[in-house]
Amino acid sequence: MKAQYFFWILFLIGFYWMLYLYQDFLMDALIAGLLCVGLFQVKVFLNKRFSNVISSFLCVLVLASVVIVPLYFIVYKGSNVIFEINFEKLSALIKWLKGTITENLSHFPAIHDGVSKFLENFSAASITGYLLKVSSYIGKYSLKLVTDALFILGLLFFFFYYGEKFYRYFLGVLPLEMNQSKKIFEEVAGILRIVLLTSLITVILEGVAFGTMIIWFGHDGWSLGILYGLASLVPAVGGALIWIPIAIYELYHGHVNEAIFIVLYSILLIGVLIDSVIKPILIVFIKKRIFKTTLKINEILIFFSMIAGISQFGFWGIIVGPTITAFFIALLRLYENYFIQKEQKTCEC
């Protein structure tokens, strides 16, 4: 057996066992690596003023405040809402909702019976039990999320500290020319920077838009604005987690016009205008004006890759989806610019 074949057999065996050993941490390591790549320009900026250790720590500290503090805020506010529920008021609200729905559906016999049977099991006791189950699930999920976040932050410090060494090492190890490897890396890093900044600005815009509106109806605009901005990152439901309960609350108190306005404002202005219209425009602006990058990836493709990533990977899909897309497109360009052209030159000769 040739030494080269023997080496690759040993390498594949070792690689398999490495994956098996660290399989529970692969996603955390991937997220930490992608965040490091996307934010490494911040690290380079801080390196001009601080030592490598301090600049790495500052980068991790900023990310920790962005990830852990909002999570604590959500858990704290959510637990307060659940444990401060007034059972009598909740029963009255449910009774009113059931009566209103049944009365309005009396003109539609085809669906009236089915909805009435469903509402028979709809009571304050069942909702309270469901909320307790949800709070228990949120508690377990939050604990796992905090554990993952702490592990990611630990890996981030490691990646930030040794980032330049890792970069040079991987460029040298890859079986490609140096400029080819750099182009792939620059493509992925550029997309990550655009996605991270776009997501941050979108969260702020949606939170400010909702908080500014809701304060006029006597609610806590600061807290609900933060919650809405964070809820907008939740796949599928997004800000509906916030505006639906508030609209129901306004309906219960007889504020029909206010409830309709909250629903339309949340769906049309925030859901359609900001999330579906302004967000793609933001991607174009950030790409061409802020980073002034020469990336040849369509902005709409970046937008849809974020949506696809969220649907497949959940919260972290915001960065995983665009990364996969950018990496694949970079490989296609590499194949087009180097391998196809090389074959054409060979044929001409």
From Swiss-Prot:
The chain crosses the membrane at residues 6-26, 27-47, 56-76, 143-163, 195-215, 224-244, 258-278, 300-320. It is a multi-pass membrane protein. It is found in: Cell membrane. Its main location: membrane. GO terms for cellular component: plasma membrane. It comes from the Bacteria. Keywords: Cell membrane, Membrane, Transmembrane, Transmembrane helix, Transport. Belongs to the autoinducer-2 exporter (AI-2E) (TC 2.A.86) family. This is Putative transport protein jhp_0514. It comes from Helicobacter pylori (strain J99 / ATCC 700824) (Campylobacter pylori J99). The lineage of its organism: Bacteria, Pseudomonadati, Campylobacterota, Epsilonproteobacteria, Campylobacterales.
